[in-house]
Amino acid sequence: MSRKNRAPKREVLPDPLYNSKLVTRLINRIMLDGKRGTASSIVYDAFSEIKEATGNDALEVFETAMDNIMPVLEVRARRVGGSNYQVPVEVRPERRTTLGLRWLVTASRARGEHTMKDRLAKEIMDAANNTGASVKKREDTHKMAEANRAFAHFRW
């Protein structure tokens, strides 16, 4: 494999229904085996379910949920003098979004509802209300960073 250049980041196109890049990234994260049609129908059905249940715009609920899921701090392992320290660092904006989407989809897949659209819709609504497994994951990450605050001076 060539080590000459780093592959350029490809621009994500906004989805046709909501004109949002975040929704496209959610569809890409849900997609398995290249089945984009299935993934987009899951997301759009979940969004219509959210609109029915809350009465609010599904995109706004989703963006609120993402704000509640995305972490601000995380810990990174740093080797200093023969021992590893968990050093708290701020999360870059791109990584914040990636982690938020990853945690949302993982938490949705772990839920008990019958269909994926139900699971995704319920997890997004829970996250918008600051509850649910994905928000708990963020809280755990922040707690870990807070607990290791003493090692913040090892930041690089």
Swiss-Prot record:
The keyword tRNA-binding applies. It holds the Pfam family Ribosomal_S7. One of its GO terms (cellular component) is small ribosomal subunit. It comes from the Bacteria. One of its GO terms (biological process) is translation. NCBIfam families: rpsG_bact (TIGR01029). PANTHER family: RIBOSOMAL PROTEIN S7. One of the primary rRNA binding proteins, it binds directly to 16S rRNA where it nucleates assembly of the head domain of the 30S subunit. Is located at the subunit interface close to the decoding center, probably blocks exit of the E-site tRNA. Part of the 30S ribosomal subunit. Contacts proteins S9 and S11. This is Small ribosomal subunit protein uS7. It comes from Streptococcus equi subsp. zooepidemicus (strain MGCS10565).
